[in-house]
Amino acid sequence: MSPSVRDARNDLASLQQQAAAEAEDIRRWWSQPRWAGTKRVYTAEDIVKRRGTFPVVEYPSSVMADKLVETLARHSRNGTVSQTFGVLDPVQMTQMVKYLDTIYVSGWQCSATASTSNEPGPDLADYPMDTVPNKVEHLFMAQLFHDRKQREARLSCTTQRELDQLGPEIDYLRPIVADADTGHGGLTAVFKLTKMFIERGAAGIHMEDQSSSNKKCGHMAGRCVIPVQEHISRLVTVRMCADVMHSNLVLVARTDSEAATLLSSNIDARDHYYIVGASNPEVTVPLIEVLDAAQQAGASGDRLAQLEEDWCKKAKLRLFHEAFADQVNASPSIKDKAGVIAKFNSQIGPQTGASIREMRKLGRELLGQDVYFDWDLPRAREGLYRYKGGTQCAIMRARAFAPYADLVWFESNFPDFQQAKEFAQGVREKFPNKWMAYNLSPSFNWPKAMPPKEQENYIQRLGEIGYVWQFITLAGLHTNALAIDNFSREFSRFGMRAYAQGIQQREMDEGVDVLKHQKWAGAEYVDSILKLAQGGVSSTASMGKGVTEEQFGSSNGAKL
């Protein structure tokens, strides 16, 4: 084909010119204040190459992401909090949006109640990867529907009195933040999962630093984290996918390292300070060999557990700096033991990122001999390294993740304000304006953890130190269980009185719109569509004469 007849799609100069213009558009997008704290390891040109030729469109989820950012920014300015909880279904969603400004979709709840395989289970992220995106779509479609239904009703009013009788407008379009777990696999899985969330209505997602093959609920034992850089690659992939799709998706980086006991690989020097090793030179046989030999000899599970406990005790499992201190204290030739230990700790600490090579070198210089420390001997059967996390470990990881995410979150085992404060100060020492999230977990025993007055103020106290988004992951599940348990018990005892007085009358008294469930489900709205399609009349309208919902007028003391 000659240059004179070659069209722009097949002319390299034209193609490059078009790509350059698209890249400039992306750079303008990235220059917005929204991205002031976001680090990207790729260029606008890299993103252009990975987009197709279809015109760039704005996903509805991106509009909701902008709304989420505005919501969190307002709370950050005011020292207030966006507080929410894990929602199970559209019924819960339509009630919570009257009072709360964001919505949370929990992977735990989806695993137990909404897996796309219909096989329930605990929160191990072993459900199909479209499970949580499907729940997001379920809720987002309901949000859009109830928003349309409400607008039709309000625009059908002919007087201010009629509009006033409907009450204040409800914002059904509250931004949804969803649980992306560990990404459900490698980086290509992370990319595809992110794409699903964007397509199905999520304003934001959170992703944690656990191993995808060993994922546990954030309040279970045996949590295994991945190297720092490996999780950064996940976060980069999420943002890259969003950039390819021209989405302003909000990303929350979660770390489970505070209570982690295992690490998948020792490749990242930032993790070396927290890896546990054997410090007793008399122990030379790896734990796994001891256990394998015992198992082959017919040892029971209890016997194997006892052997492991005995081996670990004899091996004197320590972090490197602890092993160094032990060996300094045991050395008769070192007089100023405290001074030597202090000198080591002044150069090697939780936030220094020193490698094992650097720690060994300094230890040798100060001790006069090699520090005995072997982190391979106690490795777990799966090949995992033993890890001793903690708050400082969570701070280290949150700092590493912060440039790649909009919010950071550390999963904790207790609702400990001082620990939350330590984490916030540690993060904001390096990233002063970083937003933080906090899990008000139902796995905590709240009545035991603090008195009622402190429970009432806990959210606000956290908000004042930077935790702008807080959520009860499983409140939807627990309120559902409590309500059904109570009603079932009363129904078995009192028959219809339990429903009439305990449910229906309370709906009337409290103005719960689901009282008129046909109207709530959109029967009037759909009737209006049928009438519009048939020239203004429909003999099959569902809310016409004879519908039993006429029984629920403005009488009976109902607020509706």
UniProtKB/Swiss-Prot annotation:
Biological processes per GO annotation: glyoxylate cycle; tricarboxylic acid cycle
Names of required cofactors: Mg(2+)
Keywords on record: Glyoxylate bypass, Glyoxysome, Lyase, Magnesium, Metal-binding, Peroxisome, Tricarboxylic acid cycle
Entry's Gene Ontology cellular component terms: glyoxysome
Pathway: Carbohydrate metabolism; glyoxylate cycle; (S)-malate from isocitrate: step 1/2
Keyword Magnesium: yes
Amino-acid positions noted as binding Mg(2+) in the UniProt annotation, renumbered to this chain: 179
InterPro entries: ICL/PEPM, Isocitrate_lyase, Isocitrate_lyase_ph_CS, Pyrv/PenolPyrv_kinase-like_dom, Pyrv_kinase-like_dom_sf
Enzyme class: lyase
Residue numbers binding substrate: 106-108, 218-219, 254, 439-443, 473
Domain of life assignment: Eukaryota
Gene Ontology MF annotations: isocitrate lyase activity; metal ion binding; methylisocitrate lyase activity
Catalytic activity: D-threo-isocitrate = glyoxylate + succinate; (2S,3R)-3-hydroxybutane-1,2,3-tricarboxylate = pyruvate + succinate
Subcellular localization(s) per the UniProt record: Glyoxysome
Job description of the protein: Catalyzes the formation of succinate and glyoxylate from isocitrate, a key step of the glyoxylate cycle, which operates as an anaplerotic route for replenishing the tricarboxylic acid cycle. Required for growth on ethanol or acetate, but dispensable when fermentable carbon sources are available. Also acts on 2-methylisocitrate.
Matches recorded under NCBIfam families: isocit_lyase
Name the record gives this protein: Isocitrate lyase
Organism: Eremothecium gossypii (strain ATCC 10895 / CBS 109.51 / FGSC 9923 / NRRL Y-1056)
Gene expressing this chain: ICL1
